[in-house]
Amino acid sequence: MHERYVPADVEAAAQSDWRAADAYRSKEDANRKKFYCVSMLPYPSGKLHMGHVRNYTINDVMYRYLRMNGYNTLMPMGWDAFGMPAENAAMANGVPPAQWTYENIAYMKKQMQSMGLAIDWSREVTTCKPDYYKWNQWLFLKMLEKGVAYKKTGTVNWDPVDQTVLANEQVIDGRGWRSGALVEKREIPMYYMRITQYADELLNDLDGLGWPERVKVMQHNWIGKSFGVNFGFPYELDGEKKLLRVFTTRADTIMGVTFCAIAAEHPLAARLARDKPALQAFIDECKRGGVAEADIATMEKKGVATGFSVSHPLTGEPVEVWIGNYVLMSYGEGAVMGVPAHDERDFAFAKKYGLPIRQVIAVEGETYSTDAWQEWYGDKTRAVCVNSGKYDGLAHDAAVDAIAAELKAGGLGDKQITYRLRDWGISRQRYWGTPIPIIHCPSCGDVPVPEQDLPVVLPEDLVPDGTGNPLAKSDAFLNCTCPKCGAAAKRETDTMDTFVDSAWYFSRYAAPDAQTMVDARTDYWMPMDQYIGGIEHAILHLLYSRFWAKVMRDLGLVAFGEPAKNLLTQGMVLNETFYREDAAGKKTWYNPADVTVSFDDKGRPVGAVLKSDGQPVELGGIEKMSKSKNNGVDPQMLIDHYGADTARLFTMFAAPPEQQLEWSGAGVDGASRFLRRVWAFGFANREALAVRAPFDAAQLAEADKTLRREIHGVLKQADFDYQRLQYNTVVSAAMKMLNAIEGAKGATPAVLRETYGVLLRVLYPVVPHVTFELWKALGYADEFGPLLDAPWPKVDEAALEQAEIELVLQVNGKVRGALKVAKDASREAIEAAAVADGMFAKFAEGRPAKKIIVVPGRLVNVVV
């Protein structure tokens, strides 16, 4: 054992032992309680960031603590390796996405290994490898057979210059991110998965999950179950009688309809624009720009009158039809009723275009005005109908029931339950993804690839150039024969949404070498006992993975319908930001490592200069670590300088896992100093700590009893904190333990050995390298086995008992000191001790005690 703690040497030695022992390989064991903990698999972007370090350390701490408590634990890892960033990097660097991806995986895996993570690498999954995505294709075909997957036209962003489909995030201010061309909306055939078929189950099953309430609410709102009325506005066109159908949750306001708005893609819009160039021009304008719902919500609401009217379903009055850029064909019926008096968006639209505003609900004590929108205008809890004929005076629910009944009687509509959730469009007009296993035959149409021909392998040597899908230009991939008739045919060139890859990888971890998609091992490990990842995945990934599990269950592949029992969404890692702004308002951001900050006498930052030129930079505040703000900390530099254990200790100590973590260089230094103290005590007392003499706890001297009482008391709290995932207070407990052990005067070697061994085991899940090496060097491994599988220390409840207790001494209700009495002292003995105490004499100033109040175990108050 070396005198000086050298993290690089300590960590290399520990990791060497773990590799030699294949320490983290997990096996199924029906006789043991399992614990399966998974961090969301990373995208191989090139390097780990501090968010990764925090996430994986939380997972690792959980794994090690539960393994010490006898659980059969599994912590796997993989790579979410398909996706657009690899294509962008390929275009920038002129290399195939596969090369860029595999190089990044190799480096990031090395970084993870340097962190000492308890990963079972034998279960590693890489989603861009054929042995994985084969099962994406296989399940897609099964879903196609069952009608859970299907084909229909969908709207996409089309770049007319690059001749390619753009993702929503590639559309910036309505233009393509590379070409700058105005983006168009196009309708193309795409494959969808019928997630709406599972909407109610996805909603109802949220109640049984140990997930953060915030995530449940987000999913609940995303699914968006609505109870309303679907009805039609009658009209006649080209000699045909039709209905313009809409859905509303506010049928009680139907008498306030003054216009209808339809989507630019609505069939009625195309018909009405035939001989109206201005209308067609507006439709074309609407078809340019992004198709994301978020974009629609924030953009300027515009519309054009069509000059055509439909009939109000209850009054028969004409209702003008407008085309609105805010109406989505993919939501509802592609048409909405306009009630400006009681819908904020409609109110603004009507004010902009001078449309009538007709009040049809009222709230007692409120006065309606068309001058400005007021929140109560849309209130349905207090509102009653007015200006609505026979419905006047009805509250919301009664009005909806009555109006729905009248619409139904007239054959115009009925009550309906709808969902905000839409079927999942999985087709992506991109190269780097799972090929969709469909062959297009001129004679047979769309033909599924036979199961024996799976996987359809994605060529890995193509380099995208930004102009169209490389697969469509690859004859080797594109050209094939029809499995049905043998004629020349073409492969589907669309690939699957990368959320498909991440929808089930945790099930494959359980059986990575299975010759089927999953096997019995999957039902042993799944569902995950703990899933860990960022709140940004609350909706899409987590919702799709829940859907995928239910589909797999219904196909008889697995026994579970939910992938994760518990979810932890770790907080973001924050850091200071610094910048300079030029005359044009452009900001240049500087990394905190390149800046010197000055502080006031209260430790608050008051100024900063750039180290390279000594000139001032602006303080930008504390924000999430990001490339855009250049305020990240390179984990590798941190590990190289301080060691992985210091990085792990700081990230666990600085904040509870679910809260934001503010980066602190001083905090990292403090973590490093603490580990050096742990090592220094072990080295300085190595001879005493080697003593394995048994002892009778009841016969120990007071110094030994005091130390054991403190250590076992803190151990009890640390164990509780581990169970509730409050790892920051676990570290605090370890610090208290070290302080107590260092400060123990007169403790015997045997008790020092016991208590220091408790400290090492409490710290081990957080800092496994240094504790593993100290455990071995000081002979604990010879007694208990390697720290990897050493049992969690048991609290000695007898050690917590005290012969004496300390009570707060008060005089006239004010704290004046402390009083030590026997634990079983009678009330009379406590009263006598209180009036005999010197502090009572000092503050009573000769006055006798009138009354003595004793609160057992807590305080004694003498009233004079």
UniProtKB/Swiss-Prot annotation:
Query: Which residues participate in ATP binding?
Result: K627
Give the EC number(s) listed in the UniProt record. 6.1.1.4
**InterPro entries attached to this UniProt entry:** aa-tRNA-synth_I_CS, aa-tRNA-synth_Ia, Leu-tRNA-ligase, Leu_tRNA-synth_edit, M/V/L/I-tRNA-synth_anticd-bd, Methionyl/Leucyl_tRNA_Synth, Rossmann-like_a/b/a_fold, tRNAsynth_Ia_anticodon-bd
Zinc is among the record's keywords: no
Record-linked Gene3D superfamilies: 2.20.28.290, 3.10.20.590, HUPs (3.40.50.620), Isoleucyl-tRNA Synthetase, Domain 1 (1.10.730.10), Valyl/Leucyl/Isoleucyl-tRNA synthetase, editing domain (3.90.740.10)
Catalysed reactions, semicolon-separated:
tRNA(Leu) + L-leucine + ATP = L-leucyl-tRNA(Leu) + AMP + diphosphate
Q: Which GO terms describe its biological process?
A: leucyl-tRNA aminoacylation
| Gene Ontology CC, one term | cytosol
Chain span(s) of sequence motif 'HIGH' region: 42-52
Question: Which enzyme type, at the first EC level?
Answer: ligase
One GO MF term, please? leucine-tRNA ligase activity
Record's family?
Belongs to the class-I aminoacyl-tRNA synthetase family.
Would you tell me the protein name for this molecule? Answer: Leucine--tRNA ligase
| UniProt source species | Burkholderia pseudomallei (strain K96243)
Q: What is the lineage of its organism?
A: Bacteria, Pseudomonadati, Pseudomonadota, Betaproteobacteria, Burkholderiales
Name of the gene this protein is made from: leuS
